[in-house]
Regions:
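Alpha-helical transmembrane segments and their immediate juxtamembrane cytosolic regions
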Residues: 1-231
């Protein structure tokens, strides 16, 4: 399985995740199943980013694309999340941009020296205001630093996945809900068998494959947000 196929898998799971609240009432079997499958999207995007960071010919352009489309996607994201043009957290592309910066810090930690510590803390702090909290960067980092060992990738991802599940349980209890209200969050571990299927290849280097995800992300949020607002 090449990286483009993993991206399209992320697209499919993202659609299922975001359509769950349109098609089903919360806590129904259908809703839980779609949310569980939909959890593949974020770690799949993080995995693709880690591989993109390794293989891209121009990291500056890669980062610039992430930032530009993160800004473009923010209003569609806010509309999907709240039905208005404002939402207090940044969308997933901001999370990926922060993850990209974190990989840069790891790559240049010898040059940065002791500065790499406050920079890393600052990046992780920023992601507390974006989608997927600090877990997006941690997923990405685990995929990157263990890129030569799929078993370590799987183990580290599983550990971070259970940390994210624990955090989700804590948030649920803080909101007066049962700790298991979002147990479907454990679906993030479903990326593990997919990482074993990855063949190290990019896939077809067409402009369509290059730009599809960047365009799909804001458009699908806007469309689903409109559909949900009219139900």
């Amino acid at each position: 399985m090449n990286i483009h196929k993993i991206k399209y898998l992320a697209v499919l799971s993202m659609i299922l995740d975001h359509m769950s609240s349109v098609l089903f009432a919360p806590d129904t079997i259908g809703y839980i199943i779609l949310k569980l499958i939909g959890r593949i999207a974020a770690p799949a995007m993080c995995f693709a980013l880690a591989q993109g960071f390794i293989h891209t010919l121009d990291r500056k352009k890669y980062f610039l694309r992430l930032i530009i489309f993160a800004v473009i996607s923010q209003i569609p994201y806010a509309y999907y999340m709240s039905g208005s043009i404002w939402f207090p957290t940044g969308n997933m592309l901001f999370t990926l941009a922060c993850s990209f910066l974190l990989l840069e810090v790891v790559e240049h930690h010898k040059c940065l020296g002791i500065l790499s510590i406050p920079i890393t803390i600052s990046i992780l702090y920023i992601t507390t205001f974006t989608d997927w909290f600090i877990f997006g960067p941690l997923f990405t980092l685990s995929f990157y630093i263990n890129k030569e060992n799929k078993d370590l990738q799987a183990l580290s991802h599983a550990c971070i996945s259970f940390l994210s599940l624990g955090y989700s349980a804590y948030v649920c209890m803080q909101q007066g809900l049962s700790w298991y209200s979002q147990v479907w969050q454990i679906g993030v571990i479903l990326i593990i068998p997919i990482t074993y299927l990855y063949n190290g290849k990019l896939g077809n280097k067409s402009d369509f494959n290059k730009w599809f995800f960047y365009l799909f992300y804001p458009l699908h949020l806007l469309v689903i947000g409109i559909i949900r607002s009219r139900l």
